[in-house]
């Protein structure tokens, strides 16, 4: 059964865990970001990747930037070209790069220069299991995660996958940043519920989706 996500958009920035900071509404309004996502997807369409174990991810993905994250039977890795087209990934839009750098600096990680942006598209019912971002060469760089559209319940597990995670309601325009000792922390996203079961809804009458921009320094 879906758990209700409370409206927390008016709360100040939150310290989720040591070196994990939630910047409430930092990316709002998000209409321009959605337009840029759609432009990226025209060049590199969303696709549901296969896991090394043979499963299919419920979240659809694409990338922009110098490097793109990819998964198939060979494993998880970064690639310079879109496997579907053989072409380079679309360039990262300047507003994406600027948002990521500014949010990282605000969270205490100045000088962040992302070279990869993984764009996740969550339909209603999609989820992301507990995992950690561990495919980058230099773990000294933070991760910047931008939420757009439908609300979601984010789970921060930390150093181990088990136990009782910290639950954080994410809304349109929220930005989550983590790095330092928390850089390899386990995290997850609960199954996205239909809008009528949530305290929030998709902004501006848009299609009921959640987008997530995950900025990393891959190389």
Indicate residue ranges for each PLM-predicted region.
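Non-heme Fe(II) oxygenase metal-center motifs and adjacent flexible, charged/small-residue loops
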Residues: 1-219
